[in-house]
Amino acid sequence: MGNIERRDRVTASAPRRVAALMYHSVADDSTPAMRELTVSPERFDEQVGALRAAGAQFVRASEVLGLLRGEPIDDAAPIVAITIDDAFADVLDAAAILARHDATATVFVPTAYVGMRAAWLEGEDARRPIAGWSDLAGLRDAGIELAAHGHWHIAADLNPPAVVQEDARRCRALLEDRLGVPVTTYAYPFGFHDRAGRRAIAAVGFDSAFAIFHLHARTGDDPFALPRLHVGPGISGARLAEMVRVRRPRIVEQGLRGKDRLFGAGRHVRRLGPPTSQRIAPYALDDYGRLRFGGGPDDGRP
């Protein structure tokens, strides 16, 4: 595991890029805190329609790694993976829009909160409803991929690796047990990670993991640090169709990656502060370094 970043870099016979798009909520109303993470149904419909009109090839998040490694696909058309984090209840509205455009997506699910509320958020957002297990089963049956977003929605870069690993393992086990589907990919809650966090996720048995980085995923990327492009409410359909095609100069991409790494490194000082929604208390570990799950939203399954 020590050289995972070097040994397992994505390789392919020819460079390839995939635009992994990151969404959170598709709704008409939003709080100030969630405004940039909320796209109205009308805007989402416009965006997906524009991608379809531009000839985009819609793929699942679990397919991205194989495509970057050279699995066959038409390289003349943009490759797009729509991802939706957190499984808010309005994901059902997003799924209906996707179906109208014959498009698929991947929903990253924080399993502790399924059928409950988004308790990791603050203020009134903590009352946002999360899709239930029957809702997720319906999405599965409609061709939407369900993937892992951690159990408690904790940050991979602010918690001990043992906590991150057990949290991700439990999430994967619940999804596979309750929905009967293989779960091979993961999205980091809050988007951040570090080397120890990446190793923890790899140790669970995932094939790939997604962050943010505001870049296309490309041949040569670390499979456990695949970037995504955040799509906000101010992005028109035409602009999004342009975004998935644009090729930034390599020096610009390197600068953006360096900026995100620097910001991520600065987050480590938060480990010294009190527990937050991103970082759990040390006493959550038992004597064997495993994460305790009592005393919170949990259905008692694996």
Identify the role of each PLM range.
Residues 16-27, 77-80, 99-194, 225-226:
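Metal-dependent polysaccharide deacetylase catalytic core of the NodB/CE4 family, i.e.
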Residues 38-74, 176-178, 193, 203-223, ...:
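C-terminal domain-boundary segment and adjacent tail
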Residues 93-97, 196-200:
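A short acidic, amphipathic alpha-helical/loop segment
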Residues 2-5, 11-63:
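N-terminal structural segment of carbohydrate-active enzymes
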Residues 85-86:
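Noncatalytic alpha-helical scaffolds and linker/capping helices
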Residues 110-114, 213-217, 231-232:
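Short, acidic/turn-prone active-site loops that include or flank metal/cofactor-
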Residues 89-91, 153-155, 190-196, 216-219:
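Active-site environment of divalent metal-dependent phosphoester hydrolases
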Residues 1-16, 227-302:
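Membrane-proximal basic amphipathic "stem/tether" segments
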